[in-house]
Amino acid sequence: MQYSFRLAELLGHVPDPRKRPGTIKAIVEYTGLDRHQVAALLKNEVKYIPLKALSRLCDFLIEHGHATPDQLPGALFAVEPENFWELLARRKRLEMCVGVRKDDNPDSEVSFVAASDSVLLGELLNGVTTLGGTAKLRKPVEAVSALASEELPQPEHLKQSLVWSPGQADEDEVMRRAKTVHERFSDSKGDKALVGIGSTKSNPVVEIILSRSFNCNAFESQDEVATPNERALPFFLRYRDNDPHPPSCMAGLKLSKSDTGTKEGLYYEDANGKWIRCGSGKSGEEVAFVFYLHRESQGRLEMCMGGFSGKATRLLARALGTRAQDFWPPAYASQGMQIGAFIVEFTMPAGKKETDILRTDLVATAEVTVIPHEAIARRLEKR
């Protein structure tokens, strides 16, 4: 069992170089701790803490109204997840966001969620509440102690958010609504998770999650960078020519300014800086992605996932239900962050049935590629 130090969460501290709230200075002056030690505590990067220092931190939290005496020191520690589903289930507040489309009738108040996104959302709920179907295996036959009878991790609050898919409202309104959802999540207190379902083609909150994760501008294309290695993200969705093409840090029509031959699909950068296309684009092959960033010291998780097509999204839902272990552990762990980024390639068996569009139990061979630590580190550690 592993624990994280949640000082940043109790203080509501977000390490943003553009904002300097004076948190570290205030703690240093009150406790007498070293500035670098406080910074490391806020990032959950300290392996041990003296009892005297822990006592002074508790005094600081009580005096400044961040916690009560009966909550400390326990509130400063949290059990860390040991698999993909625990990563979500251990959050106290879980928010899931999907993109919606309007009815063609301008007077209608009806809006639609893509069937594939609904299937993926349902699988997420199932996995979180049953720990991927393993919850019954973890319950003790007889509760011989209070510890043994401890309840399984599960969110205390579930929330759903709806945003306009690109093209379903004025561009400014699409961005405004997505930013509002993300800001409300960021401003909420306590341990929390936000999951954006779909790609940037259908869910603009996914764009915001990815842009904030890699410190670049949302809703701005990177197709004109000099070389592919200058892209802010280590993976790229090349739109179909007949797709909507909303400006995106993750997606576009070419890897770089000089690129002329990029084919539709998902690409990622390998450990050596080479860009690899996933799948051949042939009939019967589908591709999807999963990304998450966990700031353990803040108790904050942001995640997004989706397929290149509706079928790919439904296949991803099935993969989560049967192979969630392939999305753990995160490939990158540094600077108080854990990041997992994965591309999933599906190969369907030969033959197609007309009812495939309604099936949620599609069978396909799945190959999960982990986007390597080096590709992520090159972008985060040069900031």
Enumerate the language-model features and the residues they cover.
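DNA major-groove recognition helix of helix-turn-helix/homeodomain DNA-binding modules
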Residues: P50-Q71
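Solvent-exposed alpha-helical segments and adjacent loops
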Residues: E82-R383
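Residue at a beta-strand N-cap/secondary-structure junction
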Residues: P21, Y48-L51
